[in-house]
Amino acid sequence: MELNPQHTAVIAIHCQGDIVSGNGAFAPFFHDQVVSRNVISKIDRLLDNARESGMTVIYTRVAFKPDFSDLNANSPLLKVVEQAGCLKEGSELADIIPELAPATNDVVITHQRVGGFVPELTAVLEDRGIDTLVFAGVATNASVESTARVATDAGYRVIIAEDACSAATPEAHQASIESLGLLAEIATTADILGASSPQTV
């Protein structure tokens, strides 16, 4: 695997308290696998390496107005948001978790759908000449897969950091990875770290 840092972005998906933390609204769905797969530390390594090598670091986060007037709960996942009143803009659990806090030059994209490939993300990628996207985050079979599918259809080279993603169950994760293998490159954190080299002047 080869990566050109100048044209590569690492995208961390939904690393928010309500989604990945033990006290979050989605903890009954996702927390056990986040912990057992050691996802947070692997994402942290990917992001640190991306910054050191000169890649673009992007976070996508899903959050809604305090009155939820921008929430269209047309799917079971979004109905959970509606029922739990979670992922509310301005709440601590809607923020990126402190362990993965964005650095000054990182990009944070906020959206209101399950997938995060929104016009704001497209604009950042085009402005920076990005053609390769490395995805990590939660959940593999929901937001990661949804965003990655749109990205590959848009013509980007897509790489899934398989061991830096998780879903509600190992089976759901594996089924998603098998589907994504038809559309993207499936790699490990070690593969991606090994393909990255520090930016030279």
Show the residue positions of the predicted features.
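Active-site/binding-pocket entry motifs
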Residues: 17-18, 115
